[in-house]
């Protein structure tokens, strides 16, 4: 059995039989930013292995690092996709989604405050995580008792203040002024 990284975002597990023939290959790819999702990468790699080693059982298991694609990985494992209207990183309305598995919500910050949503407007003084808080509030209102929050792929630098505000927190100065 051999395990190791091929690249920073792709791991593999290879098993050979007694004759040294490749019997099973498990491919564990993350996404390739801006080009392939982890599912697309896994499917492509699986096909390539099967073309080169037809006797090999190749299995792709998509993974994510908490950014884009995290929710999709849970959806592939049977979670339900839940959509909600939220505020985007620059105040625009948008529909974001999270995964629900029993009473657990898996929310990726990228769905409400991700880099692709910035569309070139990289302005850390204006970008907010408010929509992420709205997703958390939606999940809680729908009965989720646990929240898993993936923090990758954000276009914000508000330290979660927008998220906390959406959940009811108030931020005051020394004079109790908002």
Where do the protein language model's features map onto the residues?
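Acidic, Ala/Val/Gly-enriched low-complexity intrinsically disordered segments
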Residues: 3, 17-19, 154
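Glycine-rich nucleotide/cofactor/substrate-binding loop typically near the N-terminus or early
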Residues: 47-119
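Conserved small/polar residues in nucleotide/adenosyl-binding loops
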Residues: 177-178
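Short glycine/serine/threonine-rich phosphate/pyrophosphate-binding segments
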Residues: 30, 70, 132, 155-160
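Short Gly/Thr/Asp-enriched flexible loops that form oxyanion-binding sites at enzyme active sites
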Residues: 39-41, 45, 149-152, 156-169
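Extreme N-terminal starter segment of soluble prokaryotic enzymes
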Residues: 22-26
